[in-house]
């Protein structure tokens, strides 16, 4: 696959592979590549905000989400409502980090085939002129969407730090 990983990152990749084997009957190289890109490489290049857990509820025309994040060792949980589970999850994450970037684009596609396929979500975010994209992958499209948004938020943190820009909000920086 062409990845060059440290021993620590290789151990993380093996853990992801084992988890994927528990979820899927057949694991392909495309599955593994999508998960490594989502879980390891994206996290290595940005601030460490990671998903600990999520719970969504869906009803006709609305959804709610409770999100728990690890923000550099600090656990934070919040809940929000939206016009679907992804919107609600994004609102809850934004409440935790203290700002809500504009969602300029959102897409999801199947990386692999079958009912237990890996879904890859992509987002394009804009906050005060800082434009980033985020990616996430999972066998659960809600989780893939949440991971993509978190990846985008992490990239906003990194870009803001590189440009010396302070992101606003109670937990922004």
Language model: regions and residue ranges:
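Terminal or standalone catalytic/regulatory effector modules within metabolic enzymes
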Residues: 1-173
């Amino acid at each position: 696959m062409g990845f060059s990983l440290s021993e620590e990152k290789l151990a993380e990749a093996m853990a992801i592979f084992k988890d994927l084997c528990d979820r899927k009957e057949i694991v392909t190289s495309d599955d593994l590549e999508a998960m490594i890109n989502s879980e390891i490489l994206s996290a290595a290049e940005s601030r460490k905000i990671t998903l600990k857990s999520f719970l969504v509820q869906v009803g006709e025309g609305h959804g709610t989400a409770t999100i728990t994040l690890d923000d550099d060792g600090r656990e934070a949980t919040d809940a929000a409502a939206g016009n679907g589970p992804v919107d609600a999850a994004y609102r809850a994450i934004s409440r935790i980090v203290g700002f809500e970037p504009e969602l300029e684009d959102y897409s999801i596609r199947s990386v692999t085939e079958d009912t237990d396929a890996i879904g890859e979500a992509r987002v394009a975010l804009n906050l005060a002129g800082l434009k980033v994209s985020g990616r996430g992958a999972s066998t659960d499209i809600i989780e893939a969407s949440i991971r993509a948004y978190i990846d985008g938020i992490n990239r906003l943190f990194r870009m803001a730090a590189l440009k010396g820009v302070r992101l606003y909000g109670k937990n922004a920086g």
